[in-house]
Amino acid sequence: MCGIVGAIAQRDVAEILLEGLRRLEYRGYDSAGLAVVDAEGHMTRLRRLGKVQMLAQAAEEHPLHGGTGIAHTRWATHGEPSEANAHPHVSEHIVVVHNGIIENHEPLREALKARGYTFVSETDTEVIAHLVNWELKQGGTLREAVLRAIPQLRGAYGTVIMDTRHPDTLLAARSGSPLVIGLGMGENFIASDQLALLPVTRRFIFLEEGDIAEITRRSVNIFDNTGAEVKRQDIESNLQYDAGDKGIYRHYMQKEIYEQPNAIKNTLTGRISHGQVDLSELGPNADELLSKVEHIQILACGTSYNSGMVSRYWFESLAGIPCDVEIASEFRYRKSAVRRNSLMITLSQSGETADTLAGLRLSKELGYLGSLAICNVPGSSLVRESDLALMTNAGTEIGVASTKAFTTQLTVLLMLVAKLSRLKGLDASIEHDIVHGLQALPSRIEQMLSQDKRIELLAEDFSDKHHALFLGRGDQYPIALEGALKLKEISYIHAEAYAAGELKHGPLALIDADMPVIVVAPNNELLEKLKSNIEEVRARGGQLYVFADQDAGFVSSDNMHIIEMPHVEEVIAPIFYTVPLQLLAYHVALIKGTDVDQPRNLAKSVTVE
């Protein structure tokens, strides 16, 4: 959601800012802008509704010269998508970009109007610009003005501020929205995501909650919200921006679906040794903590929530550990009873999901045994703030609709199940079966991907549909949830998922010839029950699309289309059956003509509530 890039250097920084914004496009946005100041304090600001490319074209027509600048991609919250609402926002000589939501912007706006300030946008960000301007008029430096302004803001923010009268300094403040400083030689940078800065530096400082940073070409000084100087460690990043080229694929999502066999191989690399799962990366004290676990609480949002739902079946049936999964935005606003020796597991592709982070922070006050993050971004807030962390190593995921991040999360979770089963002294065959299944998984998915053309033809049946129903049983029910989420995200077809046994409790009323019903049907102990549910749909004229194990005994008929899947080990079946549903959603979206990689109203990383 939104993106920030800032730079202060001796050279012109406009192209650095634009390239940074291009690398943040995957996060989702509706407008873009930048402001550059030269050594004499002359500021040029450009803003455009639409893509970064439109902003870049404007910059070609109106060349920008200056060594200090800030840039932003906006995902509308307060105020419609428009050029007037695009960042940066200006109050005389104060220029501001901001990610997050200022919850008390309305009373602040009224107070500032009473002081004579005029607002030209509908955004909460303009409040920050005028507030800093007002505080600066009361005396002191820009840093002192920011220190006085920040406590007046309620909500989440990551903001970068410059004063055109002093173009040798940038100020940044972070509370609930990530910011990272990039360190150069005689130049420094700041962004909301380190990906934006990889072309110019590999050295980073991640700001912590409440930090305020004063950045010049040759120095970075960081203060807490009382104004006391603090030290933050700089790190060398080995993160690769390896997804910038779609190659032979039409969309990043398609590319990332096809990358899943290799992504899972990367997830497994170095983590299986002598037939056992090796998670020694967790550190020397991890086994002591994990051996005490009597309950697992999982927090996540969106696709990550669905992966947590799958793992609940695994933790309970394979490791014998009770597990609860909760939507992070619900967990943080209710009073919960913490089970004894409960491990908090958080799931997030980006590691910056606002509600998940807030849930993690809350859990530290509630007496959990410890916390473990499963994440795709090293150095992210979730990773830094958790006791333990496991990286999915999926590589950069650009498409807003998650694919390889989901399957690699499940891969890590299944390895964790194996590890816990061993620590609990359970039968060694449990870990053996998990390891065997995971080692076979990449080749199984490659087999499945060979059916892409058949699924593409199937997708044509959905071209005129407005609704769809997904069904699954057991650990395939969360896969049905994920399939429905993918379809609605990128094709804009209203899709819902149900546990198949719930059909008679309401959803059966929806069944008619215009309601496609998608079913996942591996050959497991629930297959006969599932077949009964399928017959209930057939009897009412529903159009069935069944992704079934080749040995499940299904036969196609007029209103039941069988898509045979290769037989796979039961333990990896949820991961495997995810992939055809991803392909179905992708091809339906192509037929519908939607923006597959950046679907309307959605953002890749949800860094606000």
Curated annotation (Swiss-Prot):
The Glutamine amidotransferase type-2 domain, residue ranges: 2-218
EC numbers on record: 2.6.1.16
Residues of the SIS domain: 286-426, 458-599
Domain of life, per lineage: Bacteria
UniProt keyword terms in alphabetical order: Aminotransferase, Cytoplasm, Glutamine amidotransferase, Repeat, Transferase
Stored PROSITE patterns: GATASE_TYPE_2, SIS
Gene Ontology biological process terms from the UniProt entry: carbohydrate metabolic process; fructose 6-phosphate metabolic process; protein N-linked glycosylation; UDP-N-acetylglucosamine metabolic process
SUPFAM superfamilies in the record: N-terminal nucleophile aminohydrolases (Ntn hydrolases), SIS domain
Catalytic residues in the record: C2 (nucleophile), K604 (for fru-6p isomerization activity)
Catalytic activity: D-fructose 6-phosphate + L-glutamine = D-glucosamine 6-phosphate + L-glutamate
A GO CC term attached to the entry: cytosol
Pfam families registered for this protein in UniProt: GATase_6, SIS
Keyword Transferase: yes
Gene Ontology MF terms in the entry: carbohydrate derivative binding; glutamine-fructose-6-phosphate transaminase (isomerizing) activity
Main location: cytoplasm
Annotated function: Catalyzes the first step in hexosamine metabolism, converting fructose-6P into glucosamine-6P using glutamine as a nitrogen source.
Family matches, as PANTHER family: GLUCOSAMINE--FRUCTOSE-6-PHOSPHATE AMINOTRANSFERASE, ISOMERIZING (PTHR10937), GLUTAMINE--FRUCTOSE-6-PHOSPHATE TRANSAMINASE (ISOMERIZING) (PTHR10937:SF0)
Quaternary structure (record): Homodimer.
Name under which the protein is recorded: Glutamine--fructose-6-phosphate aminotransferase [isomerizing]
Organism: Salmonella paratyphi A (strain ATCC 9150 / SARB42)
